[in-house]
Structures are given as C-alpha cells and as structure tokens.
Amino acid sequence: MTWSATLALAGADGEPVDLWRTLMSHGVADLPPNRIDEEARTLETTVAVPRGRPQTVIVREERDGKAALSGTAGKRSEAVLDGMRHILRLDEDLSEFYALAADDPDLQWVTQGAGRLMRSQTVYEDVVKTICTTNTAWSGTVRMVSAIVEHLGEPAAGAPADSPFGRAFPSPAAMAAAPESFYRDVARSGYRGAYLRSLAQSVASEEIDLEELATADPDDLSDDEVAACLLALPGVGPYAAAHIMMLIGRYSRLVLDSWTRPTYASLNGRKAKDTAIERRFRRYGRYSGLAFWLFLTRDWVAEPV
C-alpha cells in the first residue's frame, strides 16, 4: 500500500520556502537515512513513527508552492507528516532574518526562500552525524553513518537488505546496546566509537536530554549555555558545537574552519581575520552564523537564468 500527501512550502509566518535549497543546504543532509537525488531533485528518507513501524518517504517539489510526499508502504499518518515538517523546518519563522537580508546586497537573494538548514528528526541524530564528520575525510563519515543506520536502524516495510536506506536512524537505546566491537570493526569509527557509545548510553538512560536544546526559549537557555552543554558531550569540540547549534536553530555563531575561511577569502577577494568576518555579519545578530553560511553556499544551487 502506498500513500501521497502535500505540504505547503511556507514558513511559520508565511514566508516562502525553496525546497531544493533546503535539501542542498549542507552536506550532512545527504547522510543516511537520507538520500538526495540531484537529477530527479528528490529526497528519500525514512522516519521513525511513535508506536509504529518506520516509513520511507519520497519528497519532491510541485509547481504550486507545495511539496509532494509519497510513502512507499504503510498508511498516511500525521506523525509522518509532522516529522517531515520538522525535517524541512516548515515550523520555523525566518521573516526577521529576511528583513535583515533584504537590506544586504550580497544576501538579498535569500529572501526568496533560502535559509532553512535541513535537520534530522532528533537532535541526537544530528549530534551523532556531526561527531562522525570530525577529523576524517567525507568518505569516512559516510562509511560510519551508513554502518550505524544499516546495522542498528529499524527497517521500514520493504527495506532492501544490506543497505542503510529504508531504515530509520537508530534510537539511543539501539546504539547503546551495540558492543564496542561494532564501532571498532563494523562502523570503523576509531576513537569516536567510545564517544558515540557513551553518548547513546547517557541519552538512553535520560541522564542527558538533547532534545530540550532545540526547544528551550533563548531567554531561558542562552546560546552560551547551549554551547556549554554541547561542549560537555563526548566527542564534541568547538567546530562540532557550532555546527550542531546551527542545526538546532541557534544561528548566532559562525562556523569558522578549514573550509569556511578560505571560501570566504575567495568570495571576498582577500583573506580576512576571524574578527573581520564576524564584524561583517554582526548586523544579523542572532542570525549571524546563518547569514555567513548562506554567503558561502549560494553557488551550491544553480540560479535561474
């Protein structure tokens, strides 16, 4: 049994959403259980469903400002639709950011629907994936995440054998139950294995609640406090913390690393100190990091002629 549904491509305040720019917003978005087809311009992902079996969903953009969703098995459910709204950040209001960008000649283009960084169903998943990006080539990241999803993720109906696709990202309990040998010999995650297992155990036992970091009001939990919480996690350093903060909607910090610095220098025509880069985007306030990221990644999507 298959099903179909549509979602309006609009933010919380009715602002436009560019689906393709959302799907292409950062590299981690293409890690299993996600699969982006650049030729067909679609996203395939498998979402966990409370008290039910995971469902694999294919998302594509329609011409009338909607996203078309099709389920490969099972029945349509609000839980799946809510999961996709969350992943695509359709519940986020970027109107304040767009008002700032409209006055910046370098970033006026984002007001047409850019700026939604595709996220995972859970903060936990984004933290695990980010840890897997540290101190390794991209091929190593893909290998680690693929093994974790393939061997520990719950399959949707019809999931192919020996594949990370068609499976939901594993729960903290599933990752905590995996032996050290899995992380060493199967995922081949090196020193990260101990970090991933420790993190999974802490989340599964409810010693740590990562999800509250994404839902807490900034007035109650400041960006500095969120950063401190993330830096206290095993395997999370300054780069990983800044990346995770972007994915949970805390955009005040710029991700300054070995890719962003030279990319900014190339686009800007000259090298710049970190303080100068931060000063350039300071006018965006709590959106400074998002503005910086979009400045760097505009050419990731070809613009209409």
Where are the regions a protein language model picked out?
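HhH-family (HhH-GPD) DNA N-glycosylase catalytic core used in base-excision repair
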Residues: 1-305
